[in-house]
Structures are given as C-alpha cells and as structure tokens.
Amino acid sequence: MKPIGTVRNDESGTWIVLEPEYIPGLEALEGFSHINVIWWFSGHDREKDRSVLRTEKPYRDGPGVMGVFATRSPLRPNPIALTAAEIIHTDQEKGLIRVTFLDAYNGTPVLDIKPYTPSLD
C-alpha cells in the first residue's frame, strides 16, 4: 500500500496533507460534511503488536477481556484505523483537508479518504 498523504496536527488544527499526485482526487469533496479517513497505526507496526488478538478491559464499562476486532486498539494483525471526521475546510490547490479531529498522531500515514454517507456508513 502507498499512503496518499499524512496527518498534520499543529496550532492551526488537524489537517490531512495529500501527496501532490493525489490532489485531483479532492474534486467535489467540499460537497460532503464528513469523511472517513483510513490511516495506518504506524507507531504499532511491529510483529509483536500484530500478534495481539485479545486485550484486557479496554473500555471502562466493557468486559474484562475483549478480542481486538471488538475494539479500536492499535494492536491488531493489520494496524489499519478508520475515523469519521467533520470537514472544516478543503484547499484543492494545496491538497489540504482541515478536519475537527483525528485520533492519529502528527505524521501518521493516510491510506484513503472516502465521503461519509449516513445511509451507507
């Protein structure tokens, strides 16, 4: 897989910064209020993290042990994450999307962006 961009968190907010060759893919995105961002848990892309299948009580009111597929844990066989985010602004010329929040670190690779469609998501 080849990342299409990265997450940038700074004093101005949270941004998705696209690689130049993917900027044309932003066309008409401004017609949507939210996007699904698929990103890579790059800080947990280690063999030992990829072998974790169960985790202890990740949620305060959850069961004592849960399978990783029932959690948002970064420790999983394929460290892929999905976050729905509200679009604040898009800049098609610069390849930027400002969003309200992403639970990803600065520099995190972004794998894909899809419009959030309530009837499908």
Residue ranges: model-predicted function:
Residues M1-A84, I88-D121:
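Glycine-rich, low-complexity intrinsically disordered segments
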